[in-house]
């Protein structure tokens, strides 16, 4: 059992040296939580048109000071912000309506809100409130200052210790068990979406691609920014109305081939993550492992085709370094079985839990969250040092421009009060066109505002 005490160093220090000196008698002191696996909480019935929100007080944009960009994804950006009144630090996910409508992902945004609003547990990031303006949608969520697993992996120079890997993977399995028991398939599981809270526990985030209880769903679905057109691997012809959801590295072959998929998609992604943690890079890349860890461009269709070809031609033969234990290799190979019907986890989570890789795991204490990844130590509530900045976030001028534009847009527009106030909407569009010269307010975004009158975003409106 890999148990860590609260003396774990900050990212500013060397993780590798610390873990090499851990003694077997280390213990932790963390609060005990009721196991949601053994005792399932009551939840509201789910529906596509659910209108309840998780906060009785709707929080308008003007209530927050936006501090910096935490991350950027296919749907939008996540900002670190502070409530002006309560001084509470939160993470605010901002989504452009124009992108959502163009990509026909309105239902997916509503599904994400439904999941975050109705499932309150220790394994999912908490949603405080949600609202919309004429151009954007906002999720006000808890800020998890322990960072994400992508940052954690990079802090180890892409060589995470096996004991720590086992600890994290076990916590992810408990999270997936909770989701699958409630009929939720995440569909975008990757290190960036696996967060660490202030108590050192794993929480899953970003449910923008999630679905409820689907089996063999049609592949005639739309796409996010960093997802790519489905193609026939035999003739490389694209099919315009067939799209793939997800991030290229983590997509299973049945999705690429349009064969339909179910909960085993999450187990495939877990196998990719396990490989990445232990070896330092995903198993299917456009370059050889020694040449490049990350793709030259996530949006380079040629590179994505190479990745997809490798995934669909996968025959259980992967590169493994000699240092890797056979039991870890066996787990990876079974999670990455190209046949989803025999893939580990196809018959339920117990298949995964019973694998010899987890022979020393006491699942009960993981369900009760008695095991930490590590104990974050932060200087203040706004400390983001556990998040390693991505390249696109390093430009401070760009970050300031983004935040200034977000606030400027809010101040310049007279936010409409209801969907029937058409004249006010048109006036707001004119004000925005005259006052905002930022790339955020491009022609597509301005031209699509009138369509919002006919789009049912399940968000409180201002």
From Swiss-Prot:
What Enzyme Commission number(s) does the record list for this chain?
A: 2.7.11.1
What enzyme class is recorded for this protein?
transferase
Q: Which GO terms describe its biological process?
A: intracellular signal transduction
What's one GO MF term for it? ATP binding
Q: Which domain of life is it from?
A: Eukaryota
Sorted keywords for this record are:
ATP-binding, Kinase, Nucleotide-binding, Serine/threonine-protein kinase, Transferase
Q: Which reaction does it catalyse?
A: L-seryl-[protein] + ATP = O-phospho-L-seryl-[protein] + ADP + H(+); L-threonyl-[protein] + ATP = O-phospho-L-threonyl-[protein] + ADP + H(+)
Detail which positions bind ATP. Answer: 70-78, 93
| Stretches assigned to the Protein kinase domain | 64-358
Q: Which CDD domains match?
A: STKc_MAST_like (cd05579)
Ranges for domain AGC-kinase C-terminal come to 359-462
Q: Region Disordered: what ranges?
A: 414-447
Among Gene3D superfamilies, the record links this protein to:
Phosphorylase Kinase, domain 1, Transferase(Phosphotransferase) domain 1
Which residue intervals are annotated with compositional bias (Low complexity) in the record? 414-439
Active-site annotation: 188 (proton acceptor)
Q: Which InterPro entries match?
A: Kinase-like_dom_sf, Prot_kinase_dom, Ser/Thr_kinase_AS, Ser_Thr_kinase_AGC
Kindly name one Pfam family recorded for this protein.
Pkinase
Similarity comment: family membership:
Belongs to the protein kinase superfamily. AGC Ser/Thr protein kinase family.
Query: Would you tell me the protein name for this molecule?
Result: Probable serine/threonine-protein kinase DDB_G0286841
Source organism per entry reads Dictyostelium discoideum
């Amino acid at each position: 059992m890999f148990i860590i005490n609260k003396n774990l160093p900050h990212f500013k220090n060397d993780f590798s040296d610390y873990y090499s000196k851990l003694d077997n008698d280390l213990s932790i002191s963390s609060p005990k939580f009721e196991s949601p696996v053994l005792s399932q909480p009551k939840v509201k019935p789910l529906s596509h048109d659910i209108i309840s929100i998780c906060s009785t007080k709707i929080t308008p944009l003007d209530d927050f000071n936006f501090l910096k960009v935490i991350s950027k994804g296919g749907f939008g950006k996540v900002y670190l912000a502070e409530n002006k009144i309560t001084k509470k630090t939160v993470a605010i996910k901002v989504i452009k309506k124009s992108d959502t409508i163009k990509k026909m992902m309105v239902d997916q945004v509503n599904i994400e809100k439904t999941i975050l609003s109705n499932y309150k547990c220790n394994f999912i990031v908490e949603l405080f409130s949600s609202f919309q303006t004429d151009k954007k949608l906002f999720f006000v969520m808890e800020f998890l200052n322990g960072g994400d697993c992508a940052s954690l992996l990079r802090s180890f120079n892409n060589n995470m210790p096996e004991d720590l890997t086992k600890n994290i993977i076990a916590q992810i399995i408990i999270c997936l068990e909770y989701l699958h028991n409630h009929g939720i398939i995440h569909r975008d599981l990757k290190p960036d979406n696996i967060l660490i809270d202030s108590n050192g526990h794993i929480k899953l985030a970003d449910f923008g691609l999630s679905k409820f209880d689907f089996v063999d769903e049609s592949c005639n679905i739309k796409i996010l920014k960093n997802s790519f057109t489905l193609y026939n691997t035999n003739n490389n012809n694209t099919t315009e109305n067939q799209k793939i959801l997800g991030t290229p590295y983590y997509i299973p072959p049945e999705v690429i081939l349009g064969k339909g998929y179910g909960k085993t998609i999450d187990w495939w992604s877990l196998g990719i993550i396990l490989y990445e943690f232990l070896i330092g890079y995903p198993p299917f890349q456009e370059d050889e492992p020694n040449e490049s860890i990350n793709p030259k461009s996530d949006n380079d269709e040629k590179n994505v085709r190479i990745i997809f070809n490798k995934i669909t031609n996968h025959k259980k033969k992967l590169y493994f370094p000699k240092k890797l234990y056979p039991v870890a290799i066996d787990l990876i190979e079974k999670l990455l079985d190209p046949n989803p019907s025999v893939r580990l986890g196809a018959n339920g989570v117990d298949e995964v839990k019973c694998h010899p890789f987890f022979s020393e795991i006491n699942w009960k204490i993981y369900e009760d969250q008695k095991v930490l990844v590590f104990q974050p130590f932060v200087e203040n509530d706004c400390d983001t040092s556990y998040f390693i900045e991505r390249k696109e976030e390093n430009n401070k001028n760009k970050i300031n421009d983004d935040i200034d534009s977000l606030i400027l847009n809010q101040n310049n527009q007279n936010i409409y009060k209801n969907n029937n106030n058409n004249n006010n909407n048109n006036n707001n569009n004119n004000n925005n066109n005259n006052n905002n010269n930022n790339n955020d307010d491009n022609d597509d975004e301005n031209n699509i505002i009138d369509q919002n009158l006919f789009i049912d975003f399940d968000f409180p409106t201002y």
